[in-house]
């Protein structure tokens, strides 16, 4: 299948491109990171340097494609950028898909668009409480892409769906909060986290499996939560301590007394029963295997933080 991956040079894109190409798909990558595109060059992969907000570039990228995996995002804190780059860019992508008779679009969504978790586990019927999201502008822009996809899915013969992600990881894992915990273990000898809070981590090969199941089943206008393993911040912090500084300790503060980032107190345990029921999705990893893989990703992050200290 001819597949376009937007944002293919990002944290998720590299692994997605690699696996799809190895499985025999013809992959085209659209990204503005010229150096990153060079690193992705391999048999079966075509690269195109450009921005999602450039309509002419998007039209060129979509030509002859049968499926699109949309990972591109500006991550700007400026609401105008989110509208002008991300929302408008997604509209360009949708319109180009219609014009080129694309069969599938899979949009990478985020738990942030759910706002604030009102229950546990969180399923796809959870309300989108944008005003209470940790990044309301980001959440709103992501929600707009979800809804645009639904509109186009029912107006045109394209299977457009959104995959909801809380925290994805592959051979590496990033994020300022994890880096902050590593730094605290190294410099303060302790990591302080809220008790009984955490989230559903998604291993990238499971994400790719979910994408492939969507391509096979062909639902339209749906949201799908995907997850590999749920971990509390206490568990993750202990994994960091074991690698960064075994003499450090983990301190769990009751949630009601927590004064740090609200991101850490929102408990994002994903209900993935919809994906299991409709797609036949299932994580390929046992809990022990998922934790071991995450430990490897954390090891790379620890090395990065140590080198910067």
Q: Whereabouts are the PLM-identified features?
A:
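N-terminal Rossmann NAD(P)H-binding glycine-rich loop of SDR-like oxidoreductase domains
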Residues: 3-23
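Mid/C-terminal beta-alpha module of Rossmann-like enzyme folds, strongest
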Residues: 185, 210-213, 217-259, 305-306
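Conserved Rossmann-fold NAD(P)-dependent oxidoreductase catalytic core, especially the SDR/UDP-sugar
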Residues: 92-137
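Conserved beta-loop-beta element that borders a ligand/cofactor-binding pocket
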Residues: 110, 146-171
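Glycine/proline-rich active-site loop of Rossmann-fold NAD(P)-dependent oxidoreductases
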Residues: 143, 156, 168-179, 188, ...
């Amino acid at each position: 299948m001819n597949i376009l991956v937007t944002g293919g040079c990002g944290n998720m894109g590299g692994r997605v491109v690699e696996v799809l190409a190895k499985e025999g798909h013809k992959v085209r990558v659209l990204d503005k990171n010229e150096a990153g595109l060079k690193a992705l060059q391999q048999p079966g992969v075509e690269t195109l340097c450009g921005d999602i907000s450039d309509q002419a570039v998007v039209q060129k990228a979509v030509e002859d494609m049968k499926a699109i995996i949309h990972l591109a995002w500006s991550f700007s804190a400026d609401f105008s950028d989110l509208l002008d780059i991300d929302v408008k860019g997604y509209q360009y992508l949708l319109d180009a898909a219609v014009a080129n008779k694309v069969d599938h679009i899979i949009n990478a969504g985020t738990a942030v668009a759910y706002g604030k978790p009102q229950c546990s586990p969180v399923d796809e019927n959870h309300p989108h409480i944008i005003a209470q999201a940790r990044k309301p502008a980001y959440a709103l822009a992501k929600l707009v892409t979800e809804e645009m996809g639904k509109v186009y899915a029912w107006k045109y013969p394209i299977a457009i769906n959104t995959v909801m992600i809380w925290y994805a990881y592959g051979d590496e894992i990033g994020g300022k909060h994890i880096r902050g915990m590593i730094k605290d273990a190294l410099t303060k000898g302790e990591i302080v986290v809220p008790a009984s809070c955490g989230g559903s981590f998604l291993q990238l090969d499971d994400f790719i499996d979910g994408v492939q199941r969507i391509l096979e089943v062909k639902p339209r206008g749906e949201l799908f939560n995907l997850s590999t393993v749920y971990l509390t911040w206490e568990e993750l912090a202990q994994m960091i301590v074991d690698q960064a500084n075994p003499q450090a300790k983990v301190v769990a503060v009751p949630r009601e007394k927590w004064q740090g980032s609200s991101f850490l107190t929102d408990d994002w345990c994903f209900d993935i029963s919809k994906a299991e029921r409709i797609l036949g999705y299932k994580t390929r990893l046992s809990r022990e295997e998922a934790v071991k893989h995450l430990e490897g990703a954390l090891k790379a992050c620890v090395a990065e933080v140590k080198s910067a200290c």
